[in-house]
């Protein structure tokens, strides 16, 4: 993961946040699919995660852990939907 990109995103660069999300979309889909199974639920989980990342990007403490942080948010959203 390119920490420079993450730092730009953390400092409010909306385009960079979008780029980071697109770079991780396959991983996000695989994780969501392993928990939810239906396309509608997967789409909802990824959409919810995207909104949260845009709102909370400034709270990421360590740029090196962006992907871990992103996937954890996604798993939490999947679990909310799965309940």
Which residue ranges define each predicted feature?
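Acidic, Ser/Thr- and Pro/Gly-rich low-complexity regulatory segments
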Residues: 1-3
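A short, charge-rich alpha-helical start-of-domain segment used by transcription regulators
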Residues: 6-30, 34
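A short, glycine- and basic residue-enriched loop/turn
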Residues: 14, 25, 39, 57-63, ...
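Structural recognition of an alpha-helix C-terminal capping motif at a helix-to-coil junction
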Residues: 30, 44-51, 55, 64-76
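Arg/Lys-rich amphipathic alpha helix in sigma70-family domain 2
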Residues: 58-61, 75-83
């Amino acid at each position: 993961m390119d920490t420079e990109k993450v730092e730009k995103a953390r400092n409010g660069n909306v385009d960079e946040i979008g780029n980071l999300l697109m770079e991780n979309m396959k991983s996000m889909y695989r994780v969501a699919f392993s928990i939810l199974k239906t396309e509608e639920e997967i789409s909802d989980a990824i959409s919810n995660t995207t909104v949260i990342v845009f709102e909370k990007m400034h709270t990421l403490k360590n740029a090196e852990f962006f992907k871990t942080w992103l996937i954890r948010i996604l798993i939490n959203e999947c679990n909310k939907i799965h309940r």
